[in-house]
Every structure is written in C-alpha cells, then in structure tokens.
C-alpha cells in the first residue's frame, strides 16, 4: 500500500509537472529565441567587422604600393632641380660648353621620362591662378599685366606622386597695383 501511495504521488507529480513545465518551456523557448537573435546579430557584426578589416588592409597595401616611392622620389627632386638650374644658368650660345649642356639636357629628359612612368608629375604653374593646395607663395609682386593672384614666376617646381602632393611649387604671386594717389601738385 505504501507502494501504491508512492506511485500515486509520483503520478500526481508527473501530471502537474507537464503543466508547470509547459509554462517553463514557453519561457525557456522565449529566452532561447532572444539568445539566438542576439547571437545572430553578433555574428553579423563580427562578419561586418571582418569585412571592414579586410577592406582596410587591402587599401593599406594599395597605398603602400602606390606611395612606396615617395621618400625616394623626394630625395631625387633636388638633383633634378640642380640639373634644371645648371641649364638655366649656362649660356646656350657658348660653344665650349655645348656638349656638356646637351648631356645635361639628355640626362634631364631621362629623369623626366622615368618620373612620368612612375606617375611623378611636375607642377609648373607659371601664368596659372595661385592654388594654395599646390603652390607656396614666396613673395607678392604688383603687376598690371596679369590678373591678381596669378603666378608670375616659379622659383622651384612642385611635384605630385599619384595625385598626392610631394612638394609644393615655390612661386611669386601677382597682386593688383596700388592705386596711385594724386600728388600735391595734381590736387592744386
């Protein structure tokens, strides 16, 4: 009889357990669904972060390839400037230096061709409007012949590598002539 009571108690507990566990299961399902949604959201974020890291790494590698020559090219610019200055200062009519002058011209042409091949472009803005992003004004000079803020003279060419400024052009910029004030004699 004690065994029957134990079995009855177990049967009662078993009958009540499914009702309680049904509510518990529904709550548990709700919690698990929320956890699943959170895990899926987190997985999407991690995938997006991974994609962003890959994209940034690809961009960094591309920039490294594109601008790897920046320091080397910057170190070559004074050599090019010296060759150009030597040509400017030498007399083209002097027959005694003609072979040397031709050699410098050919060397300079080879330099320019090589620079062009690696997308290193000269900025020679003579006569163009002043552009503060590419030019550095070394002086201002009054001029009635050209528009104000135009480049009158280029002291040193600028250069850009793949569109990025490597060195600004050093220039003299025009300004409008000062208005002439009438002299005392003209006033009288």
Swiss-Prot record:
Keyword Cytoplasm: yes
GO biological process: protein folding
CDD domains named in the record: GrpE
SUPFAM superfamilies reported for this sequence: Coiled-coil domain of nucleotide exchange factor GrpE, Head domain of nucleotide exchange factor GrpE
NCBIfam families: PRK14139.1 (NF010737), PRK14140.1 (NF010738), PRK14150.1 (NF010748), PRK14151.1 (NF010749)
Top-level taxon in the UniProt lineage: Bacteria
The protein's assembly and partners: Homodimer.
Protein name: Protein GrpE
Region (Disordered): 1-22
InterPro entries: GrpE (IPR000740), GrpE_coiled_coil (IPR013805), GrpE_head (IPR009012)
Gene Ontology cellular component list: cytosol
Subcellular location(s) of the protein: Cytoplasm
Broad class of where this protein is predominantly found: cytoplasm
Family: Belongs to the GrpE family.
GO terms, molecular function: adenyl-nucleotide exchange factor activity; protein homodimerization activity; protein-folding chaperone binding; unfolded protein binding
The protein's role, per its UniProt record: Participates actively in the response to hyperosmotic and heat shock by preventing the aggregation of stress-denatured proteins, in association with DnaK and GrpE. It is the nucleotide exchange factor for DnaK and may function as a thermosensor. Unfolded proteins bind initially to DnaJ; upon interaction with the DnaJ-bound protein, DnaK hydrolyzes its bound ATP, resulting in the formation of a stable complex. GrpE releases ADP from DnaK; ATP binding to DnaK triggers the release of the substrate protein, thus completing the reaction cycle.
Organism: Pseudomonas fluorescens (strain ATCC BAA-477 / NRRL B-23932 / Pf-5)
Keywords for the protein's UniProt record, in alphabetical order: Chaperone, Cytoplasm, Stress response
């Amino acid at each position: 009889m004690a065994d029957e009571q134990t079995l009855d108690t177990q049967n009662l507990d078993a009958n009540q357990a499914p009702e309680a566990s049904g509510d518990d299961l529904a709550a548990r399902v709700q919690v698990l669904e929320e956890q699943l949604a959170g895990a899926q959201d987190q997985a999407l974020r991690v995938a997006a972060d991974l994609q962003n890291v890959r994209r940034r790494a690809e961009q960094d590698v591309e920039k490294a390839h594109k601008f790897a020559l920046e320091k080397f090219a910057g170190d070559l610019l004074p050599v090019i400037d010296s060759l150009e200055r030597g040509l400017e200062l030498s007399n083209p009519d002097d027959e005694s230096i003609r072979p040397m002058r031709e050699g410098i011209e050919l060397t300079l042409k080879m330099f320019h061709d090589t620079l062009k091949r690696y997308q290193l472009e000269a900025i020679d803005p003579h006569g163009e409007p002043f552009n503060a992003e590419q030019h550095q004004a070394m002086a201002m000079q009054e001029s009635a012949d050209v528009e104000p803020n135009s480049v009158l003279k280029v002291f040193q060419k600028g250069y850009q590598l793949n569109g990025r400024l490597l060195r600004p052009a050093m220039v003299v910029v025009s300004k409008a002539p000062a208005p002439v004030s009438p002299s005392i004699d003209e006033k009288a």
